[in-house]
C-alpha cells in the first residue's frame, strides 16, 4: 500500500471579503502547484500559485515499470472544543461533523453489569436508552481526557467514515500554544491503538492560512472554546507574539442565555443546545451598537419556535450578546478585547512584517460566521490603526478553514515526504515527530 496522493486537491475560494484584492478566483487552467524542495519550508510547499503555466506535465519514462500499488486517500481530522470535522484529503469541505461532547452513563447504570455502552458519541446521543452525563474531553482547545478522545476517534473511523484506520494516513490539526505532549499522545494513539500506517500533525492556524492560499498572514481564529491571534510568516507561526483569549463561542452562548433570562425567558444549562441554535439563527454583530440601541425594539424583534412548539421573541439581545468579543468585561473577563489583542500582536512585529500582516488579517472559526462580524472587526481595527490600512479577509466557509487547509496540504505531492510512518515511530520513538511536524 502506498501513501502517495493521487487525487486532485481543491483550491480554496476567496469569497465576500473586505479586501477586494483577494476576491478574484483563477480558472482551473491557471491554478498550478508549487512543490518546492524541503529546504524551502512548509509554506512554500503548500501554497497554491495562481499564474499561467505553459510547461508540460512531467511524464513517467516508459522504460521504468513499477508494480501496481493499492492507493488510499489520507484522512484529515480537525478536533475542536465544539465539533470534530473529518473527511478525505482532496475534498473541498469535511464530509462528517459531530459534537465533541460525549455521554457517559451515570454510575448506578454503569454498575449493573448488563454490558451496555460506556461512551455515547455523535448520533448515539440522540434518544439514548440510559441517562447520560455529558462531558467534553477538551478545555479551551486543549485535550484533558485522552481516553474519551480515543472513543471519539473510534466512532469517527468505524461508525462515521466506516473505514479501516490501518489503511489510511491521518493528518491531525493541533491548536496554537498546545503542550508538546499533545503530539506525542496523538502518535501513541494513532500508531499503537489504531495502527495507522502514517500520520502528520499540523498547526491549526497554519492550516487556516493555507485555506486562504497565503503563505503569511495574521490568523484571527474564534472557535467554540478559545480564540487565538496568530502571526505567521512564510508558513512559520510566531509563538512569542501569539495571543490567546479564553473566551469564544461557548461563552457567547452562555451570555446570550443570561440576557434572555434577564428579559424574562427561562433557560437552564441543560438547554444550552437550544440557545446555541438561537445564536446561530437569530444573532448578529452590530456595526455600531450605540446607534443600534437607539433603533426601536420592535425593529429588532424576531420570533423563534422552541422544540415544544412554543414561540419566543428576541429583541436587542440579538446583538448585545456579541459585544462580549469587543468588551470582555461583560462576561467578567479581564482579558483584552479581540480587536485590541489583534492590534497588540501587530504592534509586536517589526515594521516590515507588520505591514505585510496588516494587509492579510484572515478570519476563521465558527463564531466568526455571525452576520456582521467581519465588518465590525474591520471597523474597530481601522479606528485603532488610523495611519495604517488593515484588511480583514474572509472565506464563505471559514468555519471549516482549518479542515480545508489540512485537505489541501495532505493532497500535495510536495508534502508526501513529511508523513511520519509507523515503522519510523517504532524505530525512533515519538520524538521523531519533530523532524517532520514543525
Swiss-Prot record:
Keywords: Cytoplasm, Cytoskeleton, Differentiation, Fertilization, Golgi apparatus, Nucleus, Spermatogenesis. Residues 36-56 are annotated as: Required for interaction with TES. Coiled coil: none annotated. The keyword Cytoplasm applies. It comes from the Eukaryota. It is found in: Cytoplasm, Cytoskeleton; Golgi apparatus; Cytoplasm; Nucleus. SMART domains: ACTIN (SM00268). GO terms for cellular component: acrosomal vesicle; cytoplasm; cytoskeleton; Golgi apparatus; male germ cell nucleus; motile cilium; nucleus; protein-containing complex. Its main location: cytoplasm. InterPro entries: Actin (IPR004000), ACTL7A_N (IPR031769), ATPase_NBD (IPR043129). Pfam families: Actin, ACTL7A_N. GO terms for biological process: acrosome assembly; fertilization; single fertilization; spermatid development. CDD domains: ASKHA_NBD_ACTL7 (cd10214). Belongs to the actin family. Interacts (via N-terminus) with TES (via LIM domain 2). Heterodimer with TES; the heterodimer interacts with ENAH to form a heterotrimer. Interacts with ACTL9. Interacts with CYLC1; the interaction may be relevant for proper acrosome attachment to the nuclear envelope. PANTHER family: ACTIN (PTHR11937). Essential for normal spermatogenesis and male fertility. Required for normal sperm head morphology, acroplaxome formation, acrosome attachment, and acrosome granule stability. May anchor and stabilize acrosomal adherence to the acroplaxome at least in part by facilitating the presence of F-actin in the subacrosomal space. May play an important role in formation and fusion of Golgi-derived vesicles during acrosome biogenesis. This is Actin-like protein 7A. The gene is ACTL7A.
Amino acid at each position: 500500500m502506498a501513501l502517495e496522493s493521487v487525487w486532485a486537491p481543491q483550491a480554496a475560494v476567496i469569497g465576500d471579503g473586505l479586501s477586494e484584492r483577494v476576491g478574484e478566483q483563477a480558472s482551473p487552467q491557471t491554478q498550478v502547484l508549487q512543490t518546492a524542495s524541503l529546504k524551502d519550508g512548509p509554506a512554500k510547499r503548500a501554497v497554491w500559485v495562481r499564474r499561467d503555466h505553459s510547461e508540460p506535465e512531467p511524464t513517467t519514462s516508459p522504460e521504468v515499470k513499477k508494480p501496481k500499488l493499492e492507493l488510499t486517500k489520507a484522512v484529515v481530522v480537525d478536533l475542536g472544543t465544539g465539533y470534530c470535522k473529518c473527511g478525505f484529503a482532496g475534498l473541498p469541505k469535511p464530509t462528517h461533523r459531530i459534537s465533541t461532547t460525549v455521554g457517559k452513563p451515570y454510575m448506578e447504570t454503569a454498575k449493573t453489569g448488563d454490558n451496555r455502552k460506556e461512551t455515547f458519541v455523535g448520533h448515539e446521543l440522540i434518544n439514548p436508552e440510559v441517562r447520560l452525563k455529558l462531558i467534553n474531553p477538551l478545555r479551551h482547545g486543549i485535550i484533558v481526557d485522552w481516553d474519551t478522545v480515543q472513543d471519539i476517534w473510534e466512532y469517527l473511523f468505524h461508525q462515521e467514515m466506516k473505514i479501516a484506520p490501518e489503511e489510511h494516513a491521518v493528518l491531525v490539526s493541533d491548536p496554537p500554544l498546545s503542550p508538546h505532549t499533545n503530539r506525542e499522545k496523538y502518535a501513541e494513539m494513532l500508531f499503537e491503538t489504531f495502527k495507522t500506517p502514517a500520520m502528520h500533525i499540523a498547526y491549526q492556524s497554519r492550516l487556516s492560512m493555507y485555506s486562504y492560499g497565503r503563505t503569511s498572514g495574521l490568523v484571527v481564529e474564534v472557535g467554540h472554546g478559545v480564540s487565538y491571534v496568530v502571526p505567521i510568516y512564510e508558513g512559520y507561526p510566531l509563538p512569542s507574539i501569539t495571543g490567546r483569549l479564553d473566551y469564544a463561542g461557548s461563552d457567547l452562548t452562555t451570555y446570550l442565555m443570561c440576557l434572555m433570562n434577564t428579559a424574562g425567558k427561562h433557560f437552564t444549562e441543560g438547554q444550552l443546545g437550544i440557545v446555541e441554535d438561537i445564536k446561530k439563527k437569530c444573532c448578529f454583530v452590530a456595526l455600531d451598537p450605540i446607534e443600534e440601541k437607539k433603533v426601536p425594539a420592535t425593529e429588532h424583534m424576531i420570533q423563534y419556535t422552541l422544540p415544544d412548539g412554543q414561540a419566543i421573541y428576541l429583541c436587542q439581545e440579538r446583538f448585545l450578546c456579541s459585544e462580549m468579543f469587543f468588551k470582555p468585561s461583560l462576561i467578567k473577563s479581564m482579558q483584552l478585547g479581540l480587536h485590541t489583542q489583534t492590534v497588540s500582536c501587530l504592534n509586536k512585529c517589526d515594521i516590515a512584517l507588520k505591514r505585510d500582516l496588516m494587509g492579510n488579517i484572515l478570519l476563521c472559526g465558527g463564531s466568526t460566521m455571525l452576520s456582521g462580524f467581519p465588518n465590525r472587526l474591520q471597523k474597530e481595527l481601522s479606528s485603532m490603526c488610523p495611519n495604517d490600512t488593515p484588511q480583514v479577509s474572509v472565506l464563505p466557509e471559514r468555519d471549516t478553514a482549518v479542515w480545508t487547509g489540512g485537505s489541501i496540504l495532505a493532497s500535495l505531492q510536495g508534502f508526501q515526504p513529511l508523513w511520519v510512518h509507523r515503522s519510523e515511530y517504532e524505530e525512533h520513538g515519538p520524538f521523531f515527530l519533530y523532524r517532520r511536524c514543525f
